[in-house]
Curated annotation (Swiss-Prot):
Transmembrane segments: 8-28, 51-71, 83-103, 132-152, 185-205, 240-260, 267-287
Cytoplasmic compartment residues: 29-50, 104-131, 206-239, 288-309
Intrachain S-S bonds: none
Entry membrane topology: Multi-pass membrane protein
Protein name: Taste receptor type 2 member 8
Residues exposed to the Extracellular side: 1-7, 72-82, 153-184, 261-266
Gene3D superfamilies tied to this protein: Rhodopsin 7-helix transmembrane proteins (1.20.1070.10)
Phylogenetic lineage: Eukaryota, Metazoa, Chordata, Craniata, Vertebrata
InterPro entries xref list: GPCR_Rhodpsn_7TM, TAS2R
SUPFAM superfamilies: Family A G protein-coupled receptor-like (SSF81321)
UniProt keyword terms in alphabetical order: G-protein coupled receptor, Glycoprotein, Membrane, Receptor, Sensory transduction, Taste, Transducer, Transmembrane, Transmembrane helix
Pfam families with a match to the protein in the record: TAS2R
A single MF term (Gene Ontology): G protein-coupled receptor activity
Recorded family membership: Belongs to the G-protein coupled receptor T2R family.
Organism this protein belongs to: Pongo pygmaeus
Length: 309
């Protein structure tokens, strides 16, 4: 039997899982339908589609990890399961981070204005090389996840020895301690793509400032399309920074939770907050993307009419 706190955790994480799958699945579905109709897909939609697929994987791994560690800690003490979950989490986490970074860099290159030769060269080449860049991100994520699987597997013998010397609760702490150092290290390495996204954000803000100074010379009475594009992209990046900050902090909380007296509560809280990043940011993408927002309005209108009939 689960405690009231466990039931609340189950309700919250299930609700977040459903919303995350619906939000990311909706983006993938709209882009896929548009791809079928037009027989081609834009670079933005291509990156978005790959991004939401990686987020669906990340959401699934977070939910599985949360349910197992919070509700069935005795099952989690099995080293092979820990290795499998940690490996898949690392792969999905890195893939999502790099794909998000690609989207942020793409926004910057397409929207920002600059006369720098390197910027102009990247602006011309980005559409042609984006598929190779995403493939490279996939390869990096796969390599990192394989490395962590190898590193964690080395502790299997020590884990097997500890199994005969400690009870379930103590062994849970031991097993978490085994994976603390490599997981923390690879958590820190995820800062690299985030720094690239942060640089793109500040450069885009700088581009908007320069553009605003230029249009002030002309009393147009409103914002031009370039300004609107800058603002939408900056809002998207700002929401990403906010959600990623929450995700990163709570991921570290989950990693360090074995040091806390109430590790189960810390673990549950960390998992619930962490899933907000891959779920919540996707809804921001829908709101700030004209095509996705208009498609959602049409869909909701059809649902409303169907319910009335």
């Amino acid at each position: 039997m689960f405690s009231p706190a466990d039931n609340i955790f189950i309700i919250l994480i299930t609700g977040e899982f459903i919303l995350g799958i619906l939000g990311n699945g909706y983006i993938a579905l709209v882009n896929w339908i548009d791809w079928i109709k037009k027989k081609k897909i834009s670079t933005t939609d291509y990156i978005l589609t790959n991004l939401v697929i990686s987020r669906i994987c990340l959401i699934s791994v977070i939910v599985v990890n949360g349910i197992v560690t919070v509700l069935y800690p005795d099952v989690y003490t099995k080293s092979k399961l820990q290795i499998a979950i940690s490996t898949f989490w690392t792969f999905a986490n890195y893939l999502n981070m790099w794909f998000t970074t690609c989207l942020n860099v793409f926004y910057f290159l397409k929207i920002a204005n600059s006369s720098h030769p390197l910027f102009l060269w990247l602006k011309q080449k980005i559409d042609m090389v984006v598929r190779w860049i995403l493939l490279g991100c996939f390869a990096i994520s796969l390599l990192v996840s394989l490395i962590i699987a190898i590193v964690l597997s080395r502790d299997y013998r020590f884990h097997a020895i500890a199994k005969h010397k400690r009870n379930i609760t103590e062994m849970f702490h031991v097993s978490k301690m085994l994976y603390f150092e490599p997981l923390t290290l690879f958590n820190l390495l995820a800062i690299v793509p985030f720094i690239v996204s942060l640089m793109s954000f500040f450069l885009l803000v700088r581009s908007l400032q320069r553009h605003t100074k230029q249009i002030k010379l002309y009393a147009t009475g409103g914002r031009d399309p370039s300004t609107e594009a800058h603002v939408r992209a900056i809002k998207t990046m700002t929401s990403f920074i906010f959600f990623f900050f929450l995700y990163y902090i709570t991921s570290l909380l989950v990693t360090f939770s074995y040091l806390m007296t109430k590790y189960k509560l810390a673990m549950a809280f960390g998992e619930i907050v962490a899933i907000l990043y891959p779920s919540g940011h996707s809804f921001i993408l829908i709101i700030l993307n004209n095509k996705l927002r208009q498609a959602s309005v049409r869909m909701l209108t059809c649902i409303k009419i169907t319910c009335v009939i």
